[in-house]
Amino acid sequence: MPPISPHAVSTLSGEDGIPKYQIDLSLPPEERYLLLAKDFSTRMQEVVPLFDEVLETLVSSAILRRLLHFLARIFLWRLYSSEETRELKGIARAANIDLYYLVALNAALDGLLGCTSGGVVVKPSWGKEREERMMHFRTLDWGMDRLRGLVVVLEFVRSADDPGVVVARSVTYAGFLGVLTGVRENLSISLNFRGSHSCSTISLRFHQLLVLLGLQPPTATRLRTALLCPKPVLSLLTLATNLSNTKTSPCYIILCDSIETVIIQKDLTHGTKRCSNQFVACTNHDQYDERGADDGVKSNLYPKANLAGMEIVLEESEERYSCIRDKWTRYAQKKAGKQKTEWLAVGEKTLKNWIQEYPIMNECTNFVCLLDPKMGQIRWLERGWVVSDSDGDDGS
């Protein structure tokens, strides 16, 4: 048996502990995730049937599904990034999983996540830095429970430079190489699924096919590049502008530098930005201002649902957004008469209570966290609820 690595530790106590792994970017890509892959091999193998479950919802014919499996083995052998492809091959060998399953996970996962993200000025309750600053709150929802067991924290280091310095941190899934939720000093990032698009549906599907075949990078790979860049972080506005003009699947990208939070509403080739230095939030539906609501232009610019049955997802998204927005509005109104300054800060405990309340946190939530870009840290992290089939069953 391999020795237990000192780099694998639990961030939480008890059975709900979320493992933490150190990923050394100075190692050859094939070797970076070996310990994680060996530790999670059984759980990752248990997730493989998700591929078939998703196929069954999309394709009713068993013969056609077998054909798609055959084609997947042939064509899903790489990601766009050669570095990530090498990392993924190392994981596949160590975990004893067919590579095409991991390629499919990395190419498609970031397009199927329900999330609540945003930024708000927080009054820290502990730590050396007690100054009020913007922090980045985040819940990540996924309807398939088997992924819950793959949640991990990654701490990235470059041992060739300084093995004691963590250059970035990420909350992700074992076997997933892009960035869904991450933080480094002066930058935090999260990615939310967008339930609609304004671009041509044909253009979008073609782009998604290219991502699946490894001919275009997934959005999460582009965010990984921003998070792990060895150079100093770009200004928030510059990074937001660059990402807005980058080709990605429709999504929301949330960026925070402790001073300001920017939400990018991305379509295929362009994006629009919302910014705030007080409070801003995003779920999985578009936010419209009154000016654009009645401009009479509805043709190709009118958002279309990404997938059939998306109406329910968008309704739940609106409920989550209304909940967090209303909490901030009531808080601001309550404080308005007590504070002469326009600058408002929410207590850290209050914010945690907000984002743990239903429906912001719900039965599909895999984890909830608070990122501190000022310090480059994951300030708080907890697993989501685990709802058993017997909940609410009184035997009657």
Segments predicted by a language model, with ranges:
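C-terminus-biased signal that marks the final domain/tail of proteins
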Residues: 1-123, 127-129, 221-396
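A contiguous strand-loop segment
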Residues: 54, 58-63, 79-220, 250
